[in-house]
């Protein structure tokens, strides 16, 4: 009888452990897919200069986690990234990248800056209209 109780407890413990493992796996999958769907790189000066030297079209996306306008811009920028594989997108965190903000003369989050190589060709702040954001990015192509 004692052995049967131990076996039953072991089975319940294994089921609970399996349930926890499946939950952890589901959370990990969600995190991976959210990272994969969002291809923008965090701003890196060396990488930015290399992209400029190569004459690439670059979008600098100044964003903040607390910014509702930035959250509205995010899916638009992600869609443009998918449509334009030659576009290089860098995210600049408004709250932590103060030197980068000074360099680009940015005073507000939700600022989008487009470069063609070393030349800035367009800039907008606070725009959430997909057509206008697409037109802004198109200036770099």
Where are these regions (language model features)?
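Non-catalytic, surface beta->alpha helical segment in thiol-disulfide oxidoreductase systems
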Residues: 116-141
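N-terminal targeting signals for export/organelle localization
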Residues: 1-40
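Short pre-active-site segment immediately N-terminal to redox-active cysteine/selenocysteine motifs
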Residues: 55-58, 62-66, 108
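A short beta-strand-turn-helix
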Residues: 40-57, 98
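Structural micro-motif
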Residues: 104-113
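Thiol-based oxidoreductase modules, predominantly thioredoxin-like and allied folds used
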Residues: 85-98
